[in-house]
UniProtKB/Swiss-Prot annotation:
This is Cell division ATP-binding protein FtsE. Changing C84A: Does not affect ATPase activity. It is found in: Cell membrane. GO terms for molecular function: ATP binding; ATP hydrolysis activity; transmembrane transporter activity.
Length: 229
């Protein structure tokens, strides 16, 4: 599903590689935590999967896509199979909950009848059926993140990338969001989540991939946040 094969990413502005000879394989349907301190390479790792960056050397593959060889019109095709959730929600403030989710399908050319069928289904999945006509500023932070997750999941992506999705949320709301991501994962979607939240990582005991200074320092099944925890 996801393979990084001897991947190095060197930025001209830095003496140290952002990623240094990374070898990782993530299978279909896995739930993986990507951890490490700020500057460890987590964001670069995710940007490579989206073809937002190209590796200096090595190969990046997502499903059938040889990511670092994609050009032009093929990049949007890759991004149709990857959903993204961010810490800051990134909702369209002038659009309703329904329209925020529908927009993700409109931009890839889905027919109106398909949109009208699928959007209510995904709003039901994330527990927002009763708030389809609300604007983002009428929602709590947890509800806004549910909209962001619905938007990322509405096209039934093969992979869901979640970059600190609970970073702005209180512990109880964070747990609700993690329950939702687990439910999505059980549908067969591969979930890769970058986080600094050791409580979430320690409680869920999923696979943990840890980066430090651009190097892969740990890849552990049923891992916890720290080696000594």
């Amino acid at each position: 599903m996801i393979t990084l094969d001897h991947v190095t990413k060197q930025y001209k502005s830095s003496a140290r590689p952002a990623l240094d000879d990374i070898n990782v394989k993530i299978d279909k349907g896995e739930f993986v935590f990507l951890i490490g301190p700020s500057g460890s390479g987590k964001s670069t790792f995710m940007r490579l999967l989206l073809a937002a960056e190209t590796p200096t050397s090595g190969d990046v593959r997502v499903s059938k896509f040889h990511v670092n060889k994609l050009r032009g019109r093929h990049v949007p095709k890759l991004r149709q199979v990857i959903g993204c959730v961010f810490q800051d929600f990134r909702l369209l403030q002038q659009k309703t909950v329904y329209d925020n989710v529908a927009f993700a399908l409109e931009v890839i050319g889905k027919r109106t009848d398909a949109i009208n069928r699928v959007v209510p289904e995904v709003l039901e999945t994330v527990g927002l059926s009763g708030k389809a006509n609300r604007l983002p500023d009428e929602l709590s932070g947890g509800e806004q993140q549910r909209v962001a997750i619905a938007r990322a999941f509405v096209n039934r992506p093969l992979v869901l990338l979640a970059d600190e999705p609970t970073g702005n949320l209180d512990p109880e709301t964070s747990r609700d969001i993690m329950d939702l991501l687990e439910r999505i994962n059980r549908t067969g979607t591969t979930v890769l989540m970058a986080t600094h939240d050791h409580h979430i990582v320690d409680s869920m005991r999923q696979r943990v991939v840890e980066l430090s200074l651009g190097r892969l320092v740990r890849d552990e099944q049923r891992g916890v946040y720290g080696m000594d925890r």
